[in-house]
């Protein structure tokens, strides 16, 4: 969906969007829905791995199918969640229904319909929407931090190289006002140490 940059919520998704493309997948609504799917699927697999919950036992093929839903999550999948949300009026419930719909198709070819239905009822079992949202937002922050950290590390290296390269070059008016000539001080390298 293209929007006019003048209608963007902030300059980050407007005029600077081409500089933040890596962050769009993470912090967009698509990114939130994708991470909700990841959290729900991880929880389902954890329940299936618990020996005391025999009703939720999944085959290796079913676990792979759950992993595949997460790995192949697409814009079309996110749109399907949004379509379901129009009926449910609940964003996290829409993710739950999407997963039941998606996994039912895969599971039914491998197991009996009643066994499939029992497993699918464990999606979101024992969770609140807040549980799913808290984890999803934490994953968004973690993934965003990885992207930003990489950019900051690159910038830090450039500043450190420039501080060394220009250490003996005199500067004129470093404060924007006439002053006696000076040289870059060790403080020019401090931002590098702070960012590291």
Regions found by a protein language model. Name each.
Residues 1-196:
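A helix-coil-helix interface module used to build multimeric assemblies
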């Amino acid at each position: 969906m293209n929007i006019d940059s003048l209608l963007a919520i902030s300059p980050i998704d407007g005029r600077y969007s081409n500089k933040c493309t890596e962050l769009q997948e993470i912090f967009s609504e698509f990114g939130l829905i994708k991470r909700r799917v990841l959290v729900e699927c991880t929880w389902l697999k954890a329940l299936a791995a618990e020996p005391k919950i025999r009703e939720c036992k999944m085959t290796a093929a079913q676990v792979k199918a759950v992993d595949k839903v997460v790995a192949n999550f697409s814009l079309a999948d996110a749109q399907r969640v949004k379509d379901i949300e129009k009926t449910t009026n609940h964003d996290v419930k829409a993710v739950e229904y999407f997963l039941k719909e998606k996994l039912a198709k895969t599971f039914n070819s491998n197991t009996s319909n009643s066994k499939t239905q029992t497993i699918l009822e464990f999606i979101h079992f024992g969770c609140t929407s807040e549980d799913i949202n808290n984890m999803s937002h934490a994953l968004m922050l973690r993934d965003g931090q990885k992207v930003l950290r990489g950019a900051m590390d690159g910038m830090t290296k450039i500043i450190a190289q420039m501080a060394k390269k220009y250490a003996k070059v005199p500067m004129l008016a470093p404060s924007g006002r006439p002053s006696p000539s000076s040289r870059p001080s060790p403080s020019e390298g401090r931002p590098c140490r702070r960012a590291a």
